[in-house]
């Protein structure tokens, strides 16, 4: 890093909420919400509301987006030795279960809950096998494709854990701002 003063410009990169800048590949977040340290507690919405929200996430738009660059027959990046056999499934990077435990989530309108749950940057495409194996586990918890006893790619898990750690404060900030906190 540099000790000198640097002029900073405020701009928005269309279609990308996070991107890398400069030779040092500094990750920059480009959004209308201020990231805040995530605050988790117990889930404060009913099972019925959870199920209703679950039926509306991922949205159709998100499911289409994770398949934009899908190549059937390509190597599965999560499970060594497996191939992508069809459409990718949209998987929450920070799980829906975890999001619903973020402080103030319960105070949001249904529309804003779905806005948070369908936040496009919080999705990745997983093969059907990988998504079924991962379930609601975090990437740090998901270590094995049990059906065939294949370890999940450590490189892939590490990349996704970094994304998860970046997204958690973004989601908390988004929830706080939508809740007027």
Give residue spans per PLM region.
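Histidine-centered active-site/metal-ligand motif
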Residues: 28-33, 91-92, 131
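A boundary/linker detector
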Residues: 34-58
